[in-house]
Amino acid sequence: MAYTDTNVTGNREDLKQLATVIAATQAPVCGLLPTRQVNNKRPVVLMDSLASPVATGHIEGTATDTGVDKFAAVGEYTGQAQRLVREWQVTKEQEAHNSAVVADKAGASEKALKELMRDKETVVCGDQGKTADVPGTTAGVTAGLGDITNASNTDFAAAYRTPAASIYSGTKADFDDAAFNAVLASMFGQGGEFLDLHLVAGTGLRSHMVVKFTRTAGAASQIDYNMNGTAVIPYTVEMYDSDFGTVKIINGNPACMPSVDRGYVIDPRYLEWGELYGEGSEEYEGRGVGSKGACDLYGTTLSQGPNGLGKVEFSDEA
């Protein structure tokens, strides 16, 4: 296990590099999000939009010095940082044993870090709204994607909320490529730019898409299996090319998604993680018991415009 940096005075080890590796495999949503440093537990994010196009011509001789406020539509979102902690401990007796499961403080710290990253993924993917912290009384809770993409979320100005049309909320049986394309059409309509998106899909949604998107009316007959003359049967959907852009489809961690049927359509330009401090591990005085410590992180989800995001949330979600 390699640490990127060690602060001897504070006895805190920076585990950012290892955390990045873990995120790529066990926390796919966190792995997608850009991270930026914030210095406030309630950072404010600003968002803006362009005025609707007009085709009105200018009349010769009329003045152009009336002035138009170009920042009247600026909206803001206030995040709420959440600290996540995973404690670890290894007794002297455990360290003395030579077993298949190596019990030492490095292994304990790494295992705690993996658990911490799954906790972070669960928070980011959750449906919870933000909760303001009260020191000594209430833990701060950051908003999850399920709440951020709620069409009626009043934490965002109405113009920047995720449109209802960008959320598929019908039954699972009715979700097909036409329904998914309607979600993408709504997202495209927000900015008019060719989309480059990621769909993080629960296992149930992913399996459903394979059946609905690769077979005729859900029947047993296949549409197109043999590609480039190979005999491989690609029973999967990894890329969806639509009229409005490309969607890369990846599996959500089943332990961290709010439902196996849930899916988030993410444009990383409109979602990020605000970090007060990153993943690290501290070791404490053991007083004869052995080695003990904790891994923690402190940050918040932030969105520069949920209107650029989409969601699949079946009405009969498992």
Language-model segments: residues:
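Flexible, glycine/threonine- and acidic-rich loop/arm segments that mediate assembly and lattice contacts
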Residues: 1-318
